[in-house]
From Swiss-Prot:
Signal peptide: none annotated. It is found in: Secreted. Keywords: Acetylcholine receptor inhibiting toxin, Neurotoxin, Postsynaptic neurotoxin, Secreted, Toxin. It comes from the Eukaryota. This is Turritoxin F21-2. Potent inhibitor of human alpha-3-beta-2 nAChRs (IC(50)=566.2 nM). Irreversibly inhibits the acetylcholine-induced response on human alpha-7/CHRNA7 (55% inhibition at 5.6 uM) and alpha-3-beta-2/CHRNA3-CHRNB2 (91% inhibition) nAChRs. Expressed by the venom duct. One of its GO terms (cellular component) is host cell postsynaptic membrane. According to molecular mass, may be composed of about 112 residues.
Length: 28
């Protein structure tokens, strides 16, 4: 699911940008 989510995140990066630090922490 990570690839699909990452792709979605990439397309909507501007929308989730505020959560980017959290996303990276979660990814780690």
């Amino acid at each position: 699911w990570f690839r699909s989510f990452k792709s979605y995140y990439g397309h909507h990066g501007s929308v989730y940008r505020p959560n980017e630090p959290n996303f990276r922490s979660f990814a780690s």
